[in-house]
Amino acid sequence: MKLAFGNRPTTPAQDVVLLIARLALGAVMIAHGWQKVDQGGLGGTADGFEAMGIPLAPAAAAFAIAIELGGGVLVVLGALTPIVGVLWALHMAGALWFVHRDAFFVADGGYELVLVLGALGLVLAATGAGRGSVDHLLGRQSEDVRQPEAVSA
């Protein structure tokens, strides 16, 4: 089954870049998800979200942990990458709106990091994981971009 989006064919160089991007972004998201688990767990994260005025804080906390930790693992593997990318973008849009919108720089509690993470999620949603991925191995992504050479008469 091919995914409806993130199904762009890639060149070998693009595959390497996508792998590096997936590993980097996945590691950042796993670290943020693990931080939530390690520093208060679901209950503590929900309490923190409620204190920040995030609606449906327990559900939002469960989603945040799942999409950061679980989504990070999936993206490192290159599995369901376009779907996770869209969910990350939505998650980061919520973080920007509810928590970080009053400043730009991270040092000021601003949105620069969540903006970049969300944008990179959209890039992965649009491009897919590349050929070095579970998505490719399972046939959810196009083979490659090379076109047959023209034959001269």
Annotate each predicted stretch with a short phrase.
Residues 1-37, 58-66, 70, 77-153:
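Extended, low-polarity transmembrane helix blocks
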Residues 38-59:
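Membrane-interface interhelical connector segments
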